[in-house]
């Protein structure tokens, strides 16, 4: 279970996924936004993505493309280049098809968040998102958003996994572990926040 933890002080998306503890959690579909851009790249879409995901784009660049591009000068060309590979684009489409509807996960996470707020005063889940990493990091953690890489949860028998992952690794790469891994990432980030320097 791999986590990239990038603690940031400002907002990573423009809007909160929810305003109250009892409101339904909505998973932010960063994966769909990036796919939409890749299908028809434009400077307008680049500006929209930078405005909507100011810090998350940088974290995603470090995870998916192993870049430290803080000014975005190479981010979008690198992104287009990475996903120009037919196999990676097929994996991207497979993930989008598998997670076209994420309401079952949102319902489970909403129930978990209700439990958290009732039993742990002042605690709640942050914003939650999905991205595609190209089989890199499972999870990106910022101080107010946790995102999982949907392409790492396509089922233990997913054909493309067999070339890259051992059977014991593939057992964890199933849709039934999506909610578990969101919650695990949140718990680990809370431990980091609470631990003394």
What are these regions (language model features)?
Residues 1-2:
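Sec-dependent signal peptide recognition
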């Amino acid at each position: 279970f791999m986590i990239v933890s990038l603690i940031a002080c400002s907002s990573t998306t423009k809007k909160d996924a929810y305003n109250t503890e009892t409101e339904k959690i909505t998973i932010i579909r960063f994966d769909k936004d990036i796919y939409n851009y890749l299908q028809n790249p434009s400077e307008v879409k680049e500006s929209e993505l930078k405005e909507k995901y100011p810090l998350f784009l940088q974290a995603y660049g470090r995870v998916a493309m192993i870049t430290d591009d803080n000014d975005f000068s190479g981010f979008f060309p690198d992104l287009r280049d990475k996903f120009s590979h037919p196999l990676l684009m097929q994996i991207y489409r497979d993930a989008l098809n598998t997670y076209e509807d994420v309401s079952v996960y949102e319902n489970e996470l909403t129930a978990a968040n209700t439990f958290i707020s009732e039993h742990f005063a002042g605690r709640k889940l942050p914003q939650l998102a999905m991205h595609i990493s190209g089989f890199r990091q499972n999870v990106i953690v910022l101080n107010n958003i946790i995102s999982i890489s949907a392409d790492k949860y396509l089922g233990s028998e997913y054909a493309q996994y067999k070339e890259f992952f051992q059977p014991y690794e593939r057992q964890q790469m199933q849709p039934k572990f999506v909610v578990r891994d969101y919650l695990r990432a949140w718990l680990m980030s809370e431990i980091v926040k609470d631990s003394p320097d």
